Amino acid sequence: MAHFSSEDQAMLQAMLRRLFQSVKEKITGAPSLECAEEILLHLEETDENFHNYEFVKYLRQHIGNTLGSMIEEEMEKCTSDRNQGEECGYDTVVQQVTKRTQESKEYKEMMHYLKNIMIAVVESMINKFEEDETRNQERQKKIQKEKSHSYRTDNCSDSDSSLNQSYKFCQGKLQLILDQLDPGQPKEVRYEALQTLCSAPPSDVLNCENWTTLCEKLTVSLSDPDPVFSDRILKFCAQTFLLSPLHMTKEIYTSLAKYLESYFLSRENHIPTLSAGVDITNPNMTRLLKKVRLLNEYQKEAPSFWIRHPEKYMEEIVESTLSLLTVKHNQSHVVSQKILDPIYFFALVDTKAVWFKKWMHAHYSRTTVLRLLETKYKSLVTTAIQQCVQYFEMCKTRKADETLGHSKHCRNKQKTFYYLGQELQYIYFIHSLCLLGRLLIYKQGRKLFPIKLKNKKGLVSLIDLLVLFTQLIYYSPSCPKMTSAAHSENYSPASMVTEVLWILSDQKECAVECLYNNIVIETLLQPIHNLMKGNEASPNCSETALIHIAGILARIASVEEGLILLLYGANMNSSEESPTGAHIIAQFSKKLLDEDISIFSGSEMLPVVKGAFISVCRHIYSTCEGLQVLITYNLHESIAKAWKKTSLLSERIPTPVEGSDSVSSVSQESQNIMAWEDNLLDDLLHFAATPKGLLLLQRTGAINECVTFIFNRYAKKLQVSRHKKFGYGVLVTRVASTAAGGIALKKSGFINELITELWSNLEYGRDDVRVTHPRTTPVDPIDRSCQKSFLALVNLLSYPAIYELVRNQDLPNKTEYSLREVPTCVIDIIDRLIILNSEAKIRSLFNYEQSHIFGLRDFIIDGLSVERNHVLVRINLVGGPLERILPPRLLEKSDNPYPWPMFSSYPLPNCYLSDITRNAGIKQDNDLDKLLLCLKISDKQTEWIENCQRQFCKMMKAKPDIISGEALIELLEKFVLHLTESPSECYFPSVEYTATDANVKNESLSSVQQLGIKMTVRYGKFLSLLKDGAENDLTWVLKHCERFLKQQQTSIKSSLLCLQGNYAGHDWFVSSLFMIMLGDKEKTFQFLHQFSRLLTSAFLWLPRLHISSYLPNDTVESGIHPVYFCSTHYIEMLLKAELPLVFSAFHMSGFAPSQICLQWITQCFWNYLDWIEICHYIATCVFLGPDYQVYICIAVFKHLQQDILQHTQTQDLQVFLKEEALHGFRVSDYFEYMEILEQNYRTVLLRDMRNIRLQST
């Protein structure tokens, strides 16, 4: 290492010279040599660019190469010492490694080498300085003897070292260079002067008084016929751009721009015409392009630093550029004789107008650019639009088989040295397209429109320009089928326009103003119209163009405003019958899937075209409102049919034989088929994004394959595209809302994987948890590192799914659990974590030390035991937020952190029992009398119903508490009786029931029903609504109800457990009616018998339609109740429209509103609302219609909005909604809000609710 080469010395010398040039201002301003040395020693602390200097980088690399491995070894030693018990902090480790390194032999050798080479480099620099100084003095004496004294004057201090003096550039030297650059000087003198100028520090050159004169002379010299001299001046300009401050580079830039402007305006320079084209091997063209490229390179770099300088510098650069780009010659009337303007050459070196993109990125420069475009240089925008118009007209008039100007971009991969006129026109078109696309992103840019074009009547509006862009996609020629290299497609017209429109669609405000317009949508859909009529889409339209159109439509459909436009058009209330964009896209997609369009039959690109348009449909049908529009097209059936066909093809692909020529072709074919199969599964899967769509998915019979597809992506940790509405986690949650979905998740291995992951996090902790800080004492019932896995499992545990997963299974209850035994199913998790009914289970969960302290205390108060006590009390008590007292879930900060008694055995401590008192009876009220009077008058059925409903609403708003007790019983009985007497109000036919008590005496209820009876009676007695003997009476009612409903059920063979026998849960609606009727079993059953004829019974009384003969067979076989695919479907649709923040919160949490609403409705809001509110919920739906079930749920979400947003942030929304009561919610408080919802949505909701018996689409 002691020896070093001359190349190393030269390299270090150049690095060191550049370092001193960069810090010269700092060290020359020092009062003494010692201060200068001090500045250099502390340069790292004072210079923010210290680590960017080449010399510093060289030293860092040299140290790393020499000492890097040794430092790593020392670090490993220290780490191993720490693991063995020697605790030491990070700073201590650094000190130890530093000390050992400095004491090493390698470090000493490295320092010796650096010292020797730096001494040699400095001495060489000093010697070179002395030689250069002597040579300069001699030259000065020969040329200007009269000024020799001033040239030799040295203004530096005697105390300065020769190293500092070597970078002193005096005024006299610059004046000498100015004189030597004069065109009359000999070539050698001019070359030498320019060489001296290039090697001088830029800051010294700038500080000289003659800098402006020098800049002007350099600009003039750019026209020098000598190419070598011209190139050296360009080299100086490039060096100035690279190393100088902005105010210096600004002078060079504006000078170069003005030079180019004068160059193009001068008649003496030979600028080619459009017909002649550009030969870049021509020396004149080469030099011109070099100058343009240099200017363009600085254009792209300037925005990164000009914000740190005064605005006037940036304005001068922008204005000089725009002035140059708007230069126009006196053009000939013949286009081919047109002299090329500067913009053509800028388009050659920067085809995609990257410079304009960078200038428009920051508000600082964008404001100036747009102001100047509006006031002085609008012609730049005008000519860009004109170029796009000309290219479009050329595409329309040119024959399809003619080779167009962009052919070389698409087909010829070799270097192009000559550009034809058509190619120049195309390159300028691409530049104009990118410039306009960037301009339209910004509001002030769009304000430049409309624009007047030459030789064109009228003004070009913003929409006109977007229509032009859109038409270019299918009128312009395209490259060969997308099988060529990726870069070949980058500059095709359709790809470029599509890229611009994609960018516009990503900016919401811009998209609304530019793309979300009926005219633009109709233009996009025009080729589809033509194809569906049997015509060609356009003279040049291809599969590639259709794929681009579909890509743009998909972007539009992925945004709410664009989706509404596609669904309903610009005027949602319009009476026009013309189909909207969504209908046209769906019709075309269905024809493609059914192969009902012959024009592309046999095309290799046909599957890609199909996939692109189905993707648009997927964005639409993955929303509730979109599915309502597209449901009539039965796209799920067409996609399923195509998937089954593709699946059969994939099975028939022969296994490639090694060595066979067909291996690659077979492999490619199989990959294409498998990719198409996955796409179709993904399309089917997205029907699960809505409750009704999930029903359609289950009807296709492909739900198992779709769930397996999700699991494969989950296992591979694949990301979802940002333009997809749903992540797969949300879809999994929705699938788990049904019994068939739960089974599919189990078969795929999804549930097994989630349970294993949860157990791993609970038992072993996460691998990526930082260990540098000790874990705090646990105060939460669940560790944050486990919460994500826990919530993922909670999302899947809906009642229908969990019933399928655990029914008919016993707890293992093993005598011993080994450490390696990992739960793999839901019943295992219940056995190991929830029902800890044996010592073996308890000890398997705790460490040896923890399990030995159990006998020392009755209870250990911590976050987990507090949570357990809360859960046990909650399970034992039934009631709403005011009807039960639940212990807190957090410890208090006091001497007695948890004053609540632990509930470990019966009876429940009295402190948890509420002292709520109920009125024995409510005095008669005038409004109630009016309502009861209405029930007796029924001359005109419609008016009578409306009067009753109006009076009921009035009472609910003013005196809601009156509607309870005996009054509520009388209201319900009389209103339902009157409704059933009118055939028009009866949805279901009358069913005669003749079973006696003896017939049902020997029938048994399920254990779930029996448990529900006990809870109901306990709750009824607590509210003083039920008396002794109520348990037998409720049992009687439930048995007769099951017998009554069994008469209306159909026989079905299904593997789903929930469809094998009676309703799979407790009948909470019957229990509620039994309590409303104050335990009168006869009244209860009579009311239910009458009520079962009304449409409302289908949605309030869930067992009413269990395997019902009134539902289509495919609906019954799915096991999905109308409450899910109808009520909760509309709840989600209204939630998105009325409470978008809440809807987004659910989406972010990966939890579905439909799942929690199904839980609320299934148990009639028990444990969520107080009894009086449950009565009002039932009465409201009976009096006002089943659609009020939807409105009440929306009102609940409105009431909970702030809580939902808060718990979304804390990532426990699922737990909050499932466990917390609806504190403060009263049905009567939201009646006016629900009436508004009724006005807006009742027609649609009731129509769909009445169609459940015909729901076969």
From Swiss-Prot:
Q: Describe the task this protein carries out.
A: Required for high-level Shh responses in the developing neural tube. Together with CDK20, controls the structure of the primary cilium by coordinating assembly of the ciliary membrane and axoneme, allowing GLI2 to be properly activated in response to Shh signaling.
Quaternary structure and partners:
Interacts with CDK20, which promotes CDK20 stability and function. Interacts with FAM149B1; may play a role in cilium assembly.
| Stretches the record annotates as Disordered | 131-160
Concerning Gene3D superfamilies, the annotation shows: Ypt/Rab-GAP domain of gyp1p, domain 3
In this protein, which residues make up the domain named Rab-GAP TBC? Answer: 1119-1242
**Pfam families in the record, alphabetically?**
BROMI (PF14961), BROMI_C (PF23440), BROMI_N (PF23431)
Q: Tell me which UniProt keywords the record has, alphabetically.
A: Cell projection, Cilium, Cytoplasm, Developmental protein
The alphabetized list of GO BP terms reads: determination of left/right symmetry; embryonic digit morphogenesis; heart development; kidney development; lens development in camera-type eye; non-motile cilium assembly; protein localization to cilium; retinal pigment epithelium development
> What PANTHER family does this protein map onto?
PROTEIN BROAD-MINDED, UPF0183 PROTEIN
Q: Which gene encodes it?
A: TBC1D32
Q: Which residue intervals are annotated with compositional bias (Basic and acidic residues) in the record? A: 134-152
Q: Does the keyword Cytoplasm feature in the UniProt annotation?
A: yes
What protein name applies here?
Protein broad-minded
Question: Where's it found, cell-wise?
Answer: Cytoplasm; Cell projection, Cilium
Native organism is: Homo sapiens (Human)
Coiled coil located at which positions? Answer: none
